[in-house]
Design a protein with these regions (language model features):
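Bacterial N-terminal signal peptides that target proteins for export
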Residues: 2-14
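Active-site mouth of glycoside hydrolases
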Residues: 33-282
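Extracellular glycoside hydrolase catalytic/binding regions
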Residues: 72-74, 181, 195-210, 216-382, ...
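Short, low-complexity, Pro/Ser/Thr/Gly-rich segments in the mature regions of secreted, periplasmic
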Residues: 410-419, 460-467
Length: 468
């Protein structure tokens, strides 16, 4: 069957499936949502739809996207080299065994700023700066942008996958960031931050438990310190700067929870995600302050119990595989001791490697590391969302995996050597008849093993079960 004919056949089926899945994703407000712990377990393995709805100019002195006339949502979605997202891409990830997608979204370009100060200067042969002081982003999100975000969320939900929606490059080290880990900045931006989250929450208040909100991405202090707060100060640590940063992170987290809960509906018990300072994971042993982002993070007060999740990010050098594995092991232990112990499960909202061109130059190490990372995280009850890659650029249009071996390593890290198979059998948590457990190739097993098995129940029915 030709690809063109197949697409004509598949797209209407996807549209019908999306309609039913989205309808079933809405849950009555009086029905109990699964706990945060259950949600993290049920996400299994995840991926980031990165460099897409999060794309932005990111530099007040070079607002190159905003210089375009008649900007449309697609201009931003494709600005960093990715195609317009199609539902077939998410279907491909679902069929491969991924059960969750994080959808990073940058909001500031799509609010009230006009960017009228951004013009081409013939004398300097450069764009004039964005005058943020006189062209404020305000508090209202543009409806065209919200509509596109809503469509992409629906693409994920329609596949019966978990979707994490966040505020992304409104934080970070760019000059356009307005969310900064500093007590004075928090006091100034609190109202705006809460207003944005109330709008997002209202837009999706009827969605069911498969949709989660993440309050903010990698929020940094006024010095743009990575690894831990105040690391970028001249002395490499400043207690005053650090204290302000950690206090601000906890304040933003509380504001986020309060704003979402105030909208009612299913948001009253929706699972919500809060990140540590910079989404730092405490990885490494080279500085005594590396654990501070974990230790200083507080679990926000919440009107409901068991519906909050912590998030960290991890990028590790894979040139030395043994060292990388040891770093993963220690990081997982530290997260369990210094963060999960506060009373909420944890996810790696992003993970990958700091090694340049690792897929081309250190592929065997990268593949082994990827599998090991997912295995270690799963053993520690930590969710994983790989950052970018796997299907990138034009490969997303086909769609296809342009790093299929890396995808396989991640999938086998969670499901075991046999990988993932979406067999059309009902799932069960029940025990099989002794001696009636088979692997996905039909081989009888002496006892259930890790991953997906086919089992015969006492009533004679056949089902599939994931054994952890």
């Amino acid at each position: 069957m030709s690809g063109k004919y197949r697409n004509r056949l598949v797209r209407p089926l996807i549209a019908v499936a999306m309609l039913f899945a989205i309808q079933s994703s809405t849950t009555a407000a009086d029905a109990d949502f699964e706990s945060a712990t259950a949600a993290v377990a049920n996400m299994r393995v995840g991926w980031n739809l990165g460099n897409t709805l999060d794309s932005n100019s990111g530099d007040v002195n070079n607002m190159w996207i905003e210089h375009w006339s008649n900007r449309q949502p697609a201009d931003y979605e494709t600005a960093w080299g990715q195609p317009v997202t199609k539902p077939e891409l998410l279907q491909m990830f679902k069929q491969a065994g991924f059960n969750a997608v994080r959808v990073p979204v940058t909001w500031y370009p799509h609010m009230e700023a006009t960017f009228s100060s951004v013009t081409w200067d013939n004398d300097t042969q450069a764009l004039t700066p964005w005058d943020m002081a006189h062209d404020d982003i305000g508090t209202q999100i543009q409806q065209e942008w919200m509509k596109r975000v809503h469509e992409v969320v629906d693409y994920v939900i329609s596949q019966d996958m978990y979707c994490i929606l966040n505020i992304h490059h409104d934080t970070g080290a760019s000059s356009t960031a307005w969310l900064i880990a500093d007590e004075a900045v928090y006091a100034r931006e609190k109202e705006r931050f809460e207003a944005v989250w109330r709008q997002i929450a209202e837009e999706f208040k009827d969605y069911g438990e498969r949709l989660l909100f993440e309050g903010y991405n990698e929020m940094l202090d006024t010095y743009d310190s990575w690894c831990f707060a105040s690391y970028a100060t001249p002395s490499k640590y400043n207690a005053t700067v650090a204290t302000s940063a950690y206090n601000a992170i906890n304040s933003y987290a509380q504001s986020f929870v309060d704003a979402v809960r105030s909208t009612g509906g299913n948001n009253a018990q929706r699972n919500l995600i809060v990140s540590t300072y910079g989404a730092c994971s405490g990885s490494g042993t080279w500085n005594t302050h590396l654990q501070d982002p974990l230790k200083k993070m507080k679990l926000p007060a919440d009107a409901v119990s068991g519906h909050l999740i912590f998030e960290v990010h991890s990028y590790i050098d894979v040139k030395n595989l043994s060292n990388a594995k040891r770093e993963v092991d220690q990081m997982v232990r530290d997260i369990k001791t210094n963060l999960a112990s506060k009373g909420a499960p944890v996810i790696f909202g992003e993970w990958g490697t700091t090694t340049d061109n690792a897929y081309d130059n250190y592929r065997s190490n990268l593949l082994a590391f990827a599998r090991y990372f997912v295995e270690a995280a799963k053993a520690g009850n930590i969710g994983t969302f790989y950052w970018m890659g796997l299907s990138n650029g034009e490969s997303r249009t086909v769609p296809e995996f342009n790093q299929a071996d890396l995808k396989d390593a991640i999938i086998k890290g969670y499901y075991g050597d046999e990988g993932y198979s979406d067999i059309a059998l009902p799932s069960t948590s029940g025990a099989p008849v002794v001696g009636s457990c088979y692997d996905l190739q039909g081989h009888r097993l002496a006892s259930p093993c890790q991953g997906i098995n086919i089992i015969r129940m006492s009533d004679g029915t056949v089902a599939k079960r994931i054994f952890n």
